From Swiss-Prot:
Protein's name in the database: Cytochrome b559 subunit beta
Pfam family, one: Cytochrom_B559
Quaternary data: Heterodimer of an alpha subunit and a beta subunit. PSII is composed of 1 copy each of membrane proteins PsbA, PsbB, PsbC, PsbD, PsbE, PsbF, PsbH, PsbI, PsbJ, PsbK, PsbL, PsbM, PsbT, PsbX, PsbY, PsbZ, Psb30/Ycf12, at least 3 peripheral proteins of the oxygen-evolving complex and a large number of cofactors. It forms dimeric complexes.
Main localization (coarse): plastid
Chain segments annotated as transmembrane: 14-30
Cofactor note: With its partner (PsbE) binds heme. PSII binds additional chlorophylls, carotenoids and specific lipids.
Any one GO cellular component localisation term in the record: plastid membrane
Disulfide bonds: none
Subcellular location as annotated: Plastid membrane
Binding of heme, residues: H18
PROSITE patterns the record matches: CYTOCHROME_B559
Keywords, comma-separated and alphabetical: Electron transport, Heme, Iron, Membrane, Metal-binding, Photosynthesis, Photosystem II, Plastid, Transmembrane, Transmembrane helix, Transport
Lineage: Eukaryota, Viridiplantae, Streptophyta, Embryophyta, Tracheophyta
C-alpha cells in the first residue's frame, strides 16, 4: 500500500500540529486561569 509513503509526511505534519497546538492550549489555559484567579 501507499501507507509507507504517506506515513512519514503524516507523522511530521502530526508532530508539527501537536507541537504548536499543545503550547498554545497551555498558554491560553494559563491566561484564563490567571484571570479567573484574579477575579
Amino acid at each position: 500500500m501507499t501507507m509507507d509513503r504517506t506515513s512519514p509526511i503524516f507523522t511530521v505534519r502530526w508532530l508539527a500540529v501537536h507541537g504548536l497546538a499543545v503550547p498554545t492550549v497551555f498558554f491560553l489555559g494559563s491566561i484564563s486561569a490567571m484571570q479567573f484567579i484574579q477575579r
